[in-house]
Amino acid sequence: MKLWQRNTIGAAVSVAACAVIVTTDLWPDWANYREATHTDNVVAVGAVGDADGQTWQVDSIRHLNTVRGIGGSGLPQGTVLNVVTVERTGTPTEIGCTGVITDGERRWSAEAVGGYGDLPPQGISSICGTPGPVQFSFLLPDDVVPTAVDVTTAQGRILVRLQL
């Protein structure tokens, strides 16, 4: 067999091996990453949208400089607590979810109710496993202008992006 034939066979085997590695090892991680940063389920400002068998809409956004509830502690210097209440109807299909707020470049996860999270009013939940409205609290630097809230599954997949 000539040298160029061996080189051609070697190149073909290398390309096939790379394709197998990308398909079996890298592609699932890349797909998980894409699901955690991009979604087709986007609800415009003031609109109502359908996603994951439910309807979603931003009900209210509050900006707080103290936390209600146990202790009512002050927030760290240079921060503000953004409290977003999301109105939703339908039966939740996910046992758990959380909120992630973004300014288009950076992302912040919702605070726990026991931390800086604001206590939800009667009739509003801080967990997604129950039907009805849900509230997310985000401790952000005071110069951040959030553009959207992503409601994500426990695995990080975005269910719906609610533009602010």
Regions found by a protein language model. Name each.
Residues M1-V83, E87-L164:
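Conserved functional micro-motifs across diverse proteins
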